[in-house]
């Protein structure tokens, strides 16, 4: 949150405009990825919300900025947090504004266990065929609370595709439509996996 000094839009010299300050903060955040983090480290910093004001002729008193970061390393996560607050503080100080900075550490990286991942892949190949299963996918920057379970017990997190055709698109897209034809494939996968693990030979 950036706290300035609101006032009439026709008299900006009497205000400390948090909108102007906020845009400079957002712009400066992007330099963290390109100039402060090792380019060999995958990292995403996305600003997704900017809220402030409710009248066209009034400069608001404050704005709220929200977003998320994604990376695979706790060290990089801490680096992002520290640098984001430094940038926020320095820009706000330069313009005479105050700020409130909050950084929530939500989910760690989801890292599959080797044996469980291999088993998951074999079961999927048995059901759908080898050409339909990607055993070495590009790491995703998406987050998943299943990561906490993998920190405690060995396991594997998999994706079951939605297929092609109408409604086939990435998650969080308003055009998404679940493909019911994939239900038997998903159900068969879980049955096969459970039977294999619970069989007498295993």
Residue map of PLM features:
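Metal-dependent amide/peptide-bond hydrolase catalytic core
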Residues: 19-202
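Fold-level recognition of mixed alpha/beta catalytic cores in primary-metabolism enzymes, strongest
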Residues: 1-27
């Amino acid at each position: 949150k950036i706290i300035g000094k609101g006032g009439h839009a026709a008299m900006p010299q009497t205000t400390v405009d948090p909108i102007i300050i906020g845009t400079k903060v957002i712009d400066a955040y992007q330099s963290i990825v390109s100039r402060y983090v090792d380019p060999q480290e995958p990292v995403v910093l996305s600003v997704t919300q900017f809220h402030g004001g409710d009248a066209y002729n009034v400069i608001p008193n404050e704005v709220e900025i929200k977003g998320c970061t994604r990376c695979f390393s706790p060290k990089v996560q801490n680096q992002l947090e520290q640098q984001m607050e430094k940038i926020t503080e320095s820009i706000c100080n330069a313009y005479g504004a105050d700020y409130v900075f909050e950084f929530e550490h939500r989910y760690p990286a989801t890292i599959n266990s080797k044996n469980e991942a291999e088993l998951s892949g074999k079961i999927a190949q048995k059901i759908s065929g080898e050409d339909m299963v990607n055993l070495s996918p590009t790491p995703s920057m998406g987050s998943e609370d299943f990561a906490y379970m993998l920190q405690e017990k060995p396991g594997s997190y998999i994706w079951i595709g939605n297929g092609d055709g109408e409604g086939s698109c990435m998650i969080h897209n308003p055009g998404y439509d679940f493909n019911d034809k994939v239900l038997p494939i998903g159900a068969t996968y879980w049955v096969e996996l459970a039977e294999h693990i619970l069989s007498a030979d295993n």
